[in-house]
């Protein structure tokens, strides 16, 4: 198959740029995270609802396709390898009831109990799904990312200090992701 030749770019104007940015650009502060805790880490609807407000930072997910280098007579042929999914991190504002942090701590303890090193061995019992909703300026969902089979591997420390005033505690949670799918604008995958 012949490679397509591209013409040199034409002179662009700000009006051309404006016509392409029809939605005004996606905003990184317009999002909502929905967490679900598995049955081994029971949490009530209050915790799930609070998480929609108190998860203050997250990321749209990354994935990677590793190259496989195949040597041939002094040259390297690059072949697409396996796809992997990065760890997903959320930052949570800690409320005085410690509800969200407590739910994550219970989840991790159910996976590996600190008292006797026992825990749930069936992955379907300790994994759950999570969602990130990217919103527009009207609060409508532009795109949804569904993270499949997540589980926490790190609940960060919370720094305590006498000289920390005018601030609220925060902590991060690192979750392992089996895979993710995106739904909505820009290359839809069929919604679940």
Task: Pin down the residues of each PLM region.
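Glycine-rich, low-complexity intrinsically disordered segments
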Residues: 1-192
């Amino acid at each position: 198959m012949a490679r397509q030749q591209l013409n040199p770019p034409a002179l662009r104007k700000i009006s051309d740029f404006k016509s392409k940015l029809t939605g005004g650009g996606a905003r990184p502060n317009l999002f909502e995270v929905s967490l679900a805790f598995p049955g081994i880490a029971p949490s009530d609807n209050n915790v799930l609802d609070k998480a929609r407000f108190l998860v203050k930072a997250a990321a749209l997910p990354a994935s990677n396709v590793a190259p496989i280098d195949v040597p041939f007579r002094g040259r390297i042929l690059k072949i697409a390898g396996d796809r992997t999914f990065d760890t997903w991190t959320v930052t949570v504002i800690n409320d005085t009831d410690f509800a969200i942090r407590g739910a994550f701590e219970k989840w991790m303890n159910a996976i590996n109990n600190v008292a006797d090193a026992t825990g749930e061995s069936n992955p379907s019992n300790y994994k759950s799904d999570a969602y990130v909703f990217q919103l527009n300026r009207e609060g409508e969902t532009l795109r949804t990312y569904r993270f499949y089979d997540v589980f926490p591997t790190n609940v960060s420390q919370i720094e305590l200090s006498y000289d920390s005033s005018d601030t609220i505690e925060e902590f991060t949670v690192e979750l392992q992701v089996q895979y993710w799918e995106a739904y909505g604008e820009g290359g839809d995958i069929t919604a679940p």
